[in-house]
Amino acid sequence: MEQNKPRLFAVILKATLLFVLLNFAFIFTHNLPFGKLSLYNNAFPGRERFPFGETKESYNLSLFDLDAMFASHILAGTTKASDEYRVFLVGDSSVWGTLLTPEQTLAGQLNATSIKACGKTVRAYNLGYPTISLTKDLMILDQTKAYQPDMVIWLTTLEAFPEDKQFESPLVANNAERIRDLIFKYELNASTKDPALNYLSKQDQTLVSQRRAVADLIRLQIYGALWASTGIDQIYPENYERAQTDLEASTDFHGLTTLNAALAIDVLDAGMRAIPVPTILVNEPMLISNGLNSDVRYNFFYPRWAYDAYRHQIAELAAAQNWHYLDLWDLVPADEFTNSAIHLTPNGETLLADKIAEAIRSTCN
């Protein structure tokens, strides 16, 4: 036994040194796109929408690796057919489809109808992500260039515009280097040194510090097998709290008294020119309350003064820039919203899909 003690100590010492070496060697892998290594579109099908969620029962999770998100998406595994007119739908949780199955989403309903554009068959891809920020949308738009879009439809709303919202999305804050590159590339007004951006120090890039990110990549693959066998990617509760229709008598919107110089118009402009294909900007439908204090606020998000000013400003800008623009703010009746003033029922999505289909056909060139 006495002779084994030195050997045991040597083994422990070697293991410790090896771990320390691997831990710090991991720093040199920081720029390697591990997220592109995926079982999706190989061992099992790609997802119809980006991974998002924090409940095991949904076989889903939220992560910050944009490469992994795209690698898990059906888009990454779909070779573009010669007769495919490829349409990307970009936006927030309303596009992603909160409380909707993939078939009930805007993309699902467009694909269920044989829409023809430029002599080809439209195939829509759901690239929505459930946080509200123009900068988040721009980051996703910039990543889509390699996937051969024929058209982009960008659905958004006023809540995505305020300057103080741009880096609030965890997906944005935790992709600081990407955002820095976008700021330089599109000459955005934002600061690359904004404290909301989480740049990784050398210590943050070690294996120990990155263990959660590595675990998330592994979990995403495991959940893929479960998702592929069940089709479940979110929880659909039988009962949920409906969107508010009785509202506070408040005119507050992000502490602003005017929208002048308060909106990230530079980010909107960058997104509209990010991809050299027809891009349709859509002011997405929202709930218009007729309940308590509905003369002051349209809904939980917006006082009337702010939303009216926003609509006027964007309409003028779109006309001046000759953008393709659809203002569908009042398209959907209030009873066709679910748990938010921007989340639609399947019937509400059908109303939206009909308008989007018309726009695709008329904008195709």
Predicted regions and their residues:
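Hydrophobic membrane-insertion alpha-helices, especially the h-region
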Residues: 11-29
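N-terminal Lys/Arg-rich, disordered targeting/topogenic segments
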Residues: 1-7
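Residue-level recognition of beta-strand->loop/alpha-helix junctions
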Residues: 126-128, 283, 327-330
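Membrane-embedded segments
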Residues: 76-166
